[in-house]
Design a protein with these regions (language model features):
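A short, compositionally biased domain-edge/stem linker segment
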Residues: 2-12
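Active-site neighborhood of phospho(di)ester-bond hydrolases with catalytic His/Asp-centered motifs
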Residues: 21-23, 47-52, 80-88, 106-108, ...
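Active-site-proximal loop/helix segment associated with metal-binding centers of metalloenzymes
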Residues: 118-210
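Core catalytic region of metal-dependent phosphoesterases/phosphodiesterases
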Residues: 22, 27-116, 193-195, 201, ...
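Glycine-rich phosphate-binding loop signature in dinucleotide/nucleotide-binding domains
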Residues: 39-43, 166-169, 223
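Extreme N-terminal starter segment of soluble prokaryotic enzymes
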Residues: 15-20
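Binuclear metal-dependent phosphoesterase catalytic core
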Residues: 13, 113-116, 213-222, 234-261
């Protein structure tokens, strides 16, 4: 169930008995649901995908076909899947909530999710380091209206919405696609080859991380009871406690539970 509260979109899952965050899935929806419901045998669980879900690479009808394949398994296990946008997603699928089934939905940036006593802030977006290649692919004629790059992929800082969130909610968990600059990955080794062909790439990647820094600072300075911060994007796994917050970078299809305090 969702409702608007001073422009804050809130999704509540009162039946959930557990919350898990998943790293990038890159279109492997059926594999993700199999892992959740069968391989790990989870039930009564809310799964939040931290971006790069894979929306926009196929026609919209394709994703309805995917849901039809996975819906029975989700219902039987009483599980739910909520997805935020990555850089490898069409932002319209999230801003417009084009996927809006009870057990399988995409949500906009700055949505609040509540479950198991947790109040979870969800913010997507990042920079595609291979965007020159993707732009070249998209420059070719496409009869099916699909794409592999979206210019509005970056995260954005919304001071007004964050102020409203700080006034109305006690946020203990944050799920983003990328991370603040003080978290891994810090090395730029993987960027240098692409940066030779993309003169603003390094600058844009720094801007991306600076935006996440501002989001963290705003929440932290407001006294939010932050305990967990999950993100994907970098295709590696890492955990560290910084400023009293446990930051977890999730690898592709990696699951990590949001523990109760």
């Amino acid at each position: 169930m969702a409702f608007i509260n001073r422009e804050i979109l809130t999704f509540n899952y009162p039946e959930a008995k557990g919350v898990v965050v998943c790293g990038d899935i890159h279109g492997a929806f059926e594999e993700m649901v199999f892992k959740l419901c069968v391989q790990y045998g989870m039930t009564d669980t809310l799964l939040i995908v931290a971006g790069d879900c894979g929306f926009g690479f196929e026609k919209s009808g394709y994703y309805e076909q995917v849901f039809n394949k996975i819906s029975r398994r989700l219902t039987k296990a009483n599980n739910w899947v909520v997805m935020i946008r990555g850089n490898h997603d069409d932002p319209a699928y999230f801003q417009e909530q084009r996927i809006h089934h009870e057990r399988f939905r995409s949500i906009p940036d700055y949505s609040i999710v509540t479950a198991c006593g947790h109040t979870i802030l969800c913010i997507g977006g990042a920079t595609s380091i291979d965007r020159t290649y993707r732009l070249a692919v998209d420059s070719r004629p496409h009869s099916d209206q699909t794409a592999c790059y979206w210019a509005d992929e970056m995260p954005y800082y919304d001071e007004e919405v964050l102020s409203a969130i700080n006034a109305q909610f006690k946020v203990d968990t944050v799920v983003t696609h990328t991370s603040p600059s003080f978290c891994e990955l810090i090395t730029k080794e993987g960027l240098m080859g692409w940066a030779k062909r993309d003169v603003t790439l390094l600058e844009d990647c720094e801007k991306e991380r600076a935006i996440l820094d501002r989001i963290f600072d705003t929440l932290f300075e407001a006294g939010q009871p932050l305990a967990h911060w999950f993100y994907g994007h970098f295709h590696q796994s890492w955990n560290a406690s910084i400023y009293g917050v446990l930051f977890s970078m999730l690898d592709i299809m990696e699951f990590k539970e949001v523990l109760r305090e």
